[in-house]
């Protein structure tokens, strides 16, 4: 048994979709969530910047004495080398690739993600490790994250933007679509409506949450309490973060603390 918290981080509010799944699967755990709201979005930043940000955030997480860290940001997963860090890391991108390879029947998978994640070809590489015969079609949708951070994920402009971005993938006869950015599940209803009922929408956070549970069980690191708590930290704007967190998690978020992450 281990009562230390689990760390979860993302560039902003997107990782809250991962936290929600973790709480559903592991309700007894305590969580430390960090959203880098000052520097969001990560998708168009350089690899060097993202690596620097990840190092700062993981230093912060070490200070919080976490037992593991969930990288709830596909862009970060796509560029960092996990072996460089001495903390247990869980990778949302790998979980998404494994889920998609499992679900596809016609072996045609679409991936929507940030520009940096698409350019890295990380999803394609991870999927083809599982099955080299799967065709992977990737599409960058950089307009999604700014809309979601502003709370406009179910708005008419979100539908219009998603329709344009998904048009190319709709023509590829895919049967599976990976939401390759943790912000995107907030637009899942819009995306599902556009893609139609014959396309399976994959939220990587579902498998990821069970991967974390399996690890904690295997290592005897589960928190013995019945109901845990979550603490929230941000580097910038709190207002939209709190609004989205309360909507997703279904509870009042009283205490969101500001962190000067650049000092780490």
Curated annotation (Swiss-Prot):
Superkingdom in the source lineage = Bacteria
Q: Which reaction does it catalyse?
A: L-glutamate = D-glutamate
In which pathway is this protein known to take part? Cell wall biogenesis; peptidoglycan biosynthesis
Q: Tell me a Gene Ontology molecular-function term this record carries.
A: glutamate racemase activity
Q: Per its UniProt record, what PROSITE patterns does this chain match?
A: ASP_GLU_RACEMASE_2
Binding sites annotated in the UniProt record for substrate:
10-11, 42-43, 74-75, 182-183
Keyword S-adenosyl-L-methionine on entry: no
Q: What EC identifiers does the entry list? A: 5.1.1.3
- Keyword Isomerase among UniProt keywords: yes
Active-site residues, Swiss-Prot/TrEMBL: 73 (proton donor/acceptor), 181 (proton donor/acceptor)
- GO BP, sorted A to Z: cell wall organization; peptidoglycan biosynthetic process; regulation of cell shape
List keywords of the entry alphabetically: Cell shape, Cell wall biogenesis/degradation, Isomerase, Peptidoglycan synthesis
- Family per record: Belongs to the aspartate/glutamate racemases family.
Reported function: Provides the (R)-glutamate required for cell wall biosynthesis.
- What's the protein name? Glutamate racemase
Q: What is the lineage of its organism?
A: Bacteria, Bacillati, Bacillota, Clostridia, Thermoanaerobacterales
């Amino acid at each position: 048994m281990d009562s230390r918290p689990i760390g979860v981080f993302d560039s902003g509010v997107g990782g809250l979709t991962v936290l929600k799944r973790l709480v559903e699967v592991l309700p007894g755990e305590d969580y430390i969530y960090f959203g880098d709201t000052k520097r969001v979005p990560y998708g168009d930043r350089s690899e060097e910047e993202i690596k620097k940000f990840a190092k700062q955030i993981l230093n912060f997480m070490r200070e919080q004495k976490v037992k593991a860290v969930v990288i709830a940001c596909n862009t970060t997963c796509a560029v960092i080398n996990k072996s460089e860090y001495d903390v247990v890391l869980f990778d949302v991108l790998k979980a998404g690739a494994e889920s998609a390879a499992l679900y596809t029947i016609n072996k045609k998978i679409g991936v929507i993600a940030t520009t940096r994640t698409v350019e890295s070809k990380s999803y394609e590489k991870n999927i083809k490790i599982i099955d080299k015969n799967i065709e992977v079609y990737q599409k960058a949708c950089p307009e999604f994250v700014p809309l979601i951070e502003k709370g406009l994920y179910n708005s008419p402009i979100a539908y219009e933007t998603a329709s344009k971005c998904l048009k190319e993938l709709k023509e590829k006869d895919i049967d599976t679509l990976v939401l390759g950015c943790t912000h995107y599940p907030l637009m899942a209803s819009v995306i599902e409506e556009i893609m139609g009922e014959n396309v399976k929408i994959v939220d990587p956070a579902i498998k990821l949450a069970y991967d974390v549970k399996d690890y904690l069980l295997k290592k005897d690191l589960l928190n013995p309490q019945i109901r845990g708590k979550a603490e929230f930290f941000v580097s910038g704007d709190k207002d939209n973060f709190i609004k989205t967190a309360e909507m997703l998690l279904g509870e009042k978020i009283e205490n969101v603390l500001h962190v000067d992450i650049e000092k780490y």
